[in-house]
């Protein structure tokens, strides 16, 4: 049983997020109607340089089960363990307000990871991050561009309004890697953020350059939904000691279940 005091605190945090107005109405409209939006990110200048340096350091030292080298990407899933500069990403007010518009009830951070797309890699298959009718829906995803996202280096493509469709790419397409009519690339300069409905059809395009393309990615879900990463039991004491009450709420550190 969650105590009334804790429940009141959670509700208060959610109400404060709901009262925000930092995400422009046109961005809200595009997110709701098209399924994704590209906006300025949370950090710039020297702080962004600090974030980039921290990202590179993490990728250089990460090891163990939270460090994954896949066919086209290299990922670190316990990113929040390493540096406080990463906190600014998931605490970004426009991002939290976007969560309110899509999830529409108290929510939590489900995953937060570093993801490097290596050079010379093929396009990813179009996909949605949740099966249609999933009990964990809705899901709000975000991508912070550590490097610029361009046509040639694997920018993420989205199929506008596909978050409203009842089928998935695998139900309709014989080649989910092929270009899809009407797809739109989420391009931007370093520091730009993409926010998207997890139900939208999307996937990175081919990185035909020799250079890697770096990003920070994550997802928010309802507080009662399953989490992709168990922050409550996995976040180290040093990281716990630095975070704010809002961060504790978003990481669900005081919830009884994840």
Positions of PLM-derived features:
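A structural signal for short, well-ordered beta-strand segments
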Residues: 111-114, 142-144, 216-220
């Amino acid at each position: 049983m969650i105590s009334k005091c804790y429940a009141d605190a959670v509700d208060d945090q959610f109400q404060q997020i709901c009262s925000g107005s930092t995400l422009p109405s046109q961005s809200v409209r595009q997110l709701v109607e098209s399924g994704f939006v590209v906006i300025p990110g949370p950090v710039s200048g020297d702080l962004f340089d600090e974030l980039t340096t921290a990202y590179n350091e993490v990728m250089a030292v990460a090891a163990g089960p939270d460090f994954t080298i896949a066919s086209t990407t290299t990922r670190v899933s316990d990113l929040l363990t390493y540096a406080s500069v990463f906190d600014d990403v998931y605490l970004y007010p426009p991002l939290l307000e976007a969560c309110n518009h899509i999830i529409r009830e108290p929510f939590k951070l489900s995953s937060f990871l570093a993801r490097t797309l290596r050079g010379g890699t093929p396009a990813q298959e179009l996909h949605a991050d949740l099966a249609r009718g999933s009990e964990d829906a809705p899901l709000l995803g975000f991508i912070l561009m550590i490097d610029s996202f361009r046509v040639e280096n694997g920018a993420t493509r989205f199929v506008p309004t596909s978050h409203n469709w009842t089928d998935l790419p695998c139900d309709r397409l014989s080649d989910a890697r092929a270009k899809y009519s009407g797809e739109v690339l989420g391009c931007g300069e370093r520091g730009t953020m993409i926010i998207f409905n997890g139900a939208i059809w999307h996937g990175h395009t081919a990185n035909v350059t020799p250079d890697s393309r770096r990003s920070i990615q994550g997802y928010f879900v309802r507080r009662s939904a399953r989490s992709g990463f168990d922050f409550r039991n996995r976040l180290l004491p040093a990281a716990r000691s630095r975070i704010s009450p809002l961060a504790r709420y978003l990481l669900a550190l005081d919830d009884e279940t994840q």
